């Protein structure tokens, strides 16, 4: 059973300078996506990024952090239960993103929670909060929500702990992407409450179309933003994510 969540959050709550809350937008680093969501994510919000394996969730998260550090002056943290820091760096180099440089400059911190999770979820989250404080982060990618869920004995326990965590991130005005795995063959998230957990929901979907892989992005939920029912084709290029300019009408979506 996970305990001590309240104490962890309260002891770290005053560690961050607070910013004036407002409806200003945080660029994702994907211009075509930002156009769909009125300029970007609402600052301080938490967005769930859900998708099957291989749909580019990690790439989207890294692009979000690199763009923030390089173009927006916003430091970030990538906290992963699944990937090691070295693997993330290797993947990032494919897109020309040098995470080593950003780490040395104090603009990015990679946190591997693979071993920390063995000491308990509270310890792992304390590690994340310490990293956020160290680099004065304004952006966080947590990978993954699905892996975190397995550490709890019940959905109710997980729900309670995550609400505490999200309240802390909101108070710190940290804009967060939480990655969630969708198993192959399923159209819903891992648990019944994940899609209601965040302020926004981005769904990445992969399917086969005429013997080729077709990737689509949907944005069924985004707080303070006009909802779009269309799906958009997207590609993972040498420079990262890119959306096709023409939407897929709802009546054409299978």
Feature roles, as predicted:
Residues 46-48, 52-117:
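Conserved P-loop
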Residues 20-29:
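Positively charged, low-complexity intrinsically disordered leader regions
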Residues 1-15, 23-24, 133-136, 206-254:
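Conserved P-loop NTPase
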Residues 28-40:
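Pre-Walker A adenine-sensing motif
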Residues 74-75, 107, 136-139, 171-179:
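Loop/turn-to-beta-strand initiation segments
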Residues 82-86, 114-118, 146-147, 176, ...:
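Conserved nucleotide-binding/hydrolysis micro-motifs of P-loop NTPases
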Residues 150-158, 162-171, 178-222:
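Conserved catalytic-core segment of NTP-binding enzymes
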Residues 113-171:
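Phosphate-binding/switch loop-helix module in NTP-utilizing enzymes
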